[in-house]
C-alpha cells in the first residue's frame, strides 16, 4: 500500500504504508515511510488517480503523466488537453477518463495509452467528473452552469440539466442510487430514479472534497481544519473532528480486511490516515501521519494487491466506456501520446511481438511434429505390408 500526493511545488510524493498487525483498537499505530519524491511536472499538480498498476497525475502544465508503480518508473505522458487538467478517473484497469479547463472529456485506453474519444463536454471548463459504479454512466459539472450525464457505452451525452450556479464537485454513491452536486458550501443530494433533489446539506465553509463512506454517509472537508460526516437521509451531521491545522484539500477512502480507512491531505503539509468506527457518530482514530513540508493539492492511495482493487463487476461483465465502432472512429490522433522513453518503448514493443511470434512458432512446430509422426506411422505400416507380401 502506498500514499501518493501532489503539491503546488510540482512534486509527486510516495509513502509506503506499514500496518502494525499486532496492534488493535484506538491504540493501533501504522507507519509511513518515504518511498519516493518525483519532480513530476513543470507546474503545480491538480489531480491524481490510481488503479492496480498505474498512478496518473494531471497538472496546470496541461499534461497527464503516467507512473508504473510496480516497476517504480515514469511510463510516459499524455498530451491532448489545452488547459489545466482538473479531474482524472480510472474505471477498472482498462480506461482512464480526464477532464480539463478546455471543456474536453477524453477517454483513454489504459493499456495502449491512446485517446479513444475526445468529447466537447462543456462550454466552459470541466470542473469535476464521477463515474457510476456500473461504468455505463458518468456525471460532469463545469463552469457553464450545467450538470451533464454521459452514456459511456455509446460515448455521447445522455442528459443535460441546467443548475443555478457553477458546481465544482459531483460524486456518485457506492451503489449508484444517488449522487451529490457541490456548489460552494452547499450539497444537493439527487436520486437517480427521479433525477431530482431529495435534500440539501449546508457546510460552514466552501467544500473542497467529499467521499461516500457508505450509501448514506458522506465525509465532507473544506476550507477549514474540520472533517464532518453527514447522513444523506436525515441531512444531519453525525460527527465532526479537527483533522488538520489548516484547510483540508483532498480525501480518499478505502476498505481492507478489518479496516475502513479515510486519508486526508491538507495545506499544512500533513497527510493523515484515520480508522473509521462502525458507528459513524464516533470520530475516527488516527492511525498515522506524515509531514511533507509542501502545500498539498491532491491525494490517492495505491493498493499493491490486485485483490484490493477488484471492481464490483467481473471482467466479462465490465462494460466498455466506448463502443467498438467509436473506438475505430476515435483512433489515436497525432500528438496524443508522448512517451519520454520512446527509444526504450520500441524495443519493448518488438519484444512483445517476438514473444507473440515465439508462442505461434511453438504451436506450429507442435503441429509439424504431429504431421511427421503420422507420416512415419503410415510409412511404417506400408513397409510392414510390403514385408508381409514379400514373405508370401
Swiss-Prot record:
Expressed in brain, colon, heart, kidney, liver, lung, muscle, peripheral blood leukocytes, placenta, small intestine, spleen and thymus. Residues 312-392 are annotated as: Disordered. The modification Phosphoserine is found at residue 320. Keywords: Nucleus, Phosphoprotein, Repeat, Ribosome biogenesis, Signal transduction inhibitor, WD repeat. It is found in: Nucleus, Nucleolus. Coiled coil: none annotated. GO terms for molecular function: protein kinase inhibitor activity. This is p21-activated protein kinase-interacting protein 1. It comes from Homo sapiens (Human). The lineage of its organism: Eukaryota, Metazoa, Chordata, Craniata, Vertebrata.
Amino acid at each position: 500500500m502506498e500514499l501518493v500526493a501532489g503539491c503546488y511545488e510540482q512534486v509527486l510524493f510516495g509513502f509506503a504504508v506499514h500496518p502494525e498487525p499486532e496492534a488493535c483498537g484506538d491504540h493501533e499505530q501504522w507507519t509511513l515511510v518515504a518511498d519516493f519524491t518525483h519532480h513530476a511536472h513543470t507546474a503545480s499538480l491538480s489531480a491524481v488517480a490510481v488503479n492496480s498498476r498505474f498512478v496518473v497525475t494531471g497538472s496546470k502544465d496541461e499534461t497527464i503523466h503516467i507512473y508504473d508503480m510496480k516497476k517504480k518508473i515514469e511510463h510516459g505522458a499524455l498530451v491532448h488537453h489545452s488547459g489545466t487538467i482538473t479531474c482524472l478517473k480510472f474505471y477498472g484497469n482498462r480506461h482512464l477518463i480526464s477532464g480539463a479547463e478546455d471543456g474536453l472529456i477524453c477517454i483513454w485506453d489504459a493499456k495502449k495509452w491512446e485517446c479513444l474519444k475526445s468529447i466537447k463536454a462543456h462550454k466552459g471548463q470541466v470542473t469535476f467528473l464521477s463515474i457510476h459504479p456500473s461504468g455505463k454512466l458518468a456525471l460532469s459539472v463545469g463552469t457553464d452552469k450545467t450538470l451533464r450525464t454521459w452514456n459511456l457505452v455509446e460515448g455521447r451525452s445522455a442528459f443535460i440539466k441546467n443548475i443555478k450556479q457553477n458546481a465544482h464537485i459531483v460524486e456518485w454513491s457506492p451503489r449508484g442510487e444517488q449522487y451529490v452536486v457541490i456548489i460552494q458550501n452547499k450539497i444537493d443530494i439527487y436520486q437517480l430514479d427521479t433525477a431530482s433533489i431529495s435534500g440539501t446539506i449546508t457546510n460552514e465553509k466552501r467544500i473542497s472534497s467529499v467521499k461516500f463512506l457508505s450509501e448514506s454517509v458522506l465525509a465532507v472537508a473544506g476550507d477549514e481544519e474540520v472533517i464532518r460526516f453527514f447522513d444523506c437521509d436525515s441531512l444531519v451531521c453525525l460527527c465532526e473532528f479537527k483533522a488538520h491545522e489548516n484547510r483540508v484539500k483532498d480525501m480518499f477512502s478505502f476498505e481492507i480486511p478489518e479496516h475502513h480507512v479515510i486519508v486526508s491531505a491538507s495545506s499544512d503539509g500533513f497527510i493523515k490516515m484515520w480508522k473509521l468506527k462502525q458507528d459513524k457518530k464516533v470520530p475516527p482514530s488516527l492511525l498515522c501521519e506524515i509531514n511533507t513540508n509542501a502545500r498539498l493539492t491532491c491525494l490517492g492511495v495505491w493498493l499493491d494487491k490486485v485483490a484490493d482493487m477488484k471492481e464490483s463487476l467481473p471482467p466479462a461483465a465490465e462494460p466498455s466506456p466506448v463502443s467498438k465502432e467509436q473506438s475505430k472512429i476515435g483512433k489515436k490522433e497525432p500528438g496524443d501520446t508522448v512517451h519520454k522513453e520512446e527509444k526504450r518503448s520500441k524495443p519493448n514493443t518488438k519484444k512483445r511481438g517476438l514473444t507473440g511470434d515465439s508462442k505461434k512458432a511453438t504451436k506450429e512446430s507442435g503441429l509439424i511434429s504431429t504431421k511427421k509422426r503420422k507420416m512415419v506411422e503410415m510409412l511404417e505400416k506400408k513397409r510392414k505390408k510390403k514385408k508381409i507380401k514379400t514373405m508370401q
